[in-house]
């Protein structure tokens, strides 16, 4: 059963309904669900779906010819295969689809280009001369994000400016991901999402009839299951110096987020080299560099500023719990690793993913105009500002601190400060006062609202004071079941 991806399906169907030729580039990291999304889109439509392989150009051309000939095109009456790519690709115009769009999907298109670098030029010539004004739709799909972004979509590439649509597929959000385990409790949905993230391939390995703990033991920590070797497989497929990348990813997963800290923890002494490795991981969609939501452009461009974090929840889980315990897992001590390593730390581990869930919740509320104001920027904030200090005369002091979620309107005259707590105890009154104390200097020229997000409800004092302090309270049930 196909789950989610309504936005992607709408985008593709809208393009399909448009008149004239359509040339779509759809790309994203491996396992994100591109192929399945395209196959779902093709259902009920006459089409050719061709999956490229890592092979020689003559074999690729032969395989493409074989696939095209199955569509009963006129050429099959006098040839068994095309002799060149220009004739092969032009044959799209001969597909016997009547008034329907002649739909061609080329999956893993970078493999085709690697075997024959002239493919983009051939396609460009056909597009300019014939395809642009014809009833065709060609979708070029690929996982090699660096190739697509730096070469295929660059100004130097023959296809530059020809695409009528460019769509970068990202992993599913929380609300789509939890459709894979609809009967879980609200808390378990957050825990499962914290472990798996929004990668469909990972979500399908999960048995929704088993508990979160049992799934972790059976489908992640047990040698031989798909997810046990997934991280190692992906890194070896995409990168060369896997031992170094392992060290860097582990350092980030364990909470080292600054460039210098990552370099020291991973024992890559040269930060410039560490920066290059991190850049490669960012291109693969495994790591991202996060700057404060109000950072200026100069700060955003400086790799020494901001923090690095793993964007893939499953990578974060594996390097937090599996990677350092592989010897025990290889010996079959799955229960021991789970009981003594994973289970005690899982709620704390999930608290980071809960922040992502809360940010997604806020984005969805904005779509429905259910926030106090419309924000222009939303994200994490870090820097020096006021914090609560009862020993100080004013009750405040200046210190480095973070804000889980900060929304700022277009004029920077209205703010929403959000704090997220994923724990079994209610959001305490002391934590509430800590939240109110932050960014006090800005309150002289801006209106402030507050939003508290909690797994286990709120202290009664908070509930009593919330309205007069412009504080919105969102319990777990409200967040998880919003959509």
What kind of feature is each model-predicted range?
Residues 1-336:
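Phosphate-binding site recognition
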Residues 306-483:
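A cross-kingdom feature that marks ATP-driven nucleic-acid transaction machinery
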């Amino acid at each position: 059963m196909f789950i989610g991806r309504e936005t992607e399906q709408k985008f593709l169907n809208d393009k399909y309904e448009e008149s004239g030729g359509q040339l779509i580039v759809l790309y994203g990291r491996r396992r994100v669900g591109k192929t399945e999304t395209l196959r779902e889109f093709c259902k009920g439509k006459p089409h050719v779906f061709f999956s490229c392989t890592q092979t020689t150009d003559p074999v690729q051309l032969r395989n493409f010819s074989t696939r095209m000939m199955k569509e009963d095109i006129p050429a099959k009456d006098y040839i068994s295969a095309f002799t060149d790519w220009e004739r092969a690709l032009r044959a799209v115009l001969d597909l016997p689809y009547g008034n329907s769009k002649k739909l061609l999907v080329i999956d893993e298109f970078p493999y085709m280009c690697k075997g024959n670098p002239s493919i983009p030029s051939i396609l460009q010539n056909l597009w300019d001369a014939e395809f642009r004004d014809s009833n065709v739709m060609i979708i070029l799909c690929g996982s090699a994000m660096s190739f697509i972004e730096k070469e295929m979509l660059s100004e130097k590439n023959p296809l530059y400016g020809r695409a009528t649509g460019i769509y970068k597929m990202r992993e599913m959000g929380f609300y789509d991901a939890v459709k894979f385990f609809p009967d879980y409790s609200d808390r378990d949905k957050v825990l499962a999402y914290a472990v798996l993230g929004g990668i469909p391939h990972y979500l399908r390995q999960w048995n929704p009839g088993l508990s979160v703990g049992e799934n972790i033991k059976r489908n992640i920590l047990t040698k031989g299951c798909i997810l046990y070797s997934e991280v190692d497989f992906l890194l070896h497929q995409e990168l060369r110096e896997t031992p170094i990348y392992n060290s860097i990813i582990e350092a980030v997963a364990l909470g080292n987020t600054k460039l210098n800290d990552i370099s020291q923890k991973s024992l890559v002494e040269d930060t410039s080299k560490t920066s290059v490795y991190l850049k490669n991981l960012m291109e693969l969609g495994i790591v991202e560099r996060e700057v404060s939501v109000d950072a200026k452009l100069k700060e955003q461009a400086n790799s020494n500023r901001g923090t690095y974090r793993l964007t893939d929840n499953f990578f974060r889980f594996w390097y937090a719990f599996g990677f350092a315990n592989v010897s025990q897992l290889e010996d079959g001590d799955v229960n021991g690793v789970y009981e003594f390593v994973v289970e005690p730390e899982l709620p704390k581990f999930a608290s980071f993913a809960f922040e992502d869930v809360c940010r997604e919740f806020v984005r969805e509320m904005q779509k429905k105009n259910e926030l106090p104001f419309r924000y222009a920027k939303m994200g994490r904030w870090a820097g020096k500002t006021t914090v609560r200090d009862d020993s100080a005369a004013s009750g405040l002091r200046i210190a480095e601190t973070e804000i889980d979620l900060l929304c700022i309107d277009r004029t920077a005259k209205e703010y929403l400060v959000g704090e997220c707590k994923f724990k079994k105890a209610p959001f305490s009154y002391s934590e509430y006062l800590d939240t109110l104390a932050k960014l006090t200097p800005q309150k002289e020229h801006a209106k402030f609202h507050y939003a508290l997000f909690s797994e286990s409800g709120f202290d009664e004092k908070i509930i009593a004071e919330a309205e007069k302090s412009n504080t919105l309270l969102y319990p777990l049930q409200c967040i998880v079941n919003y959509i």
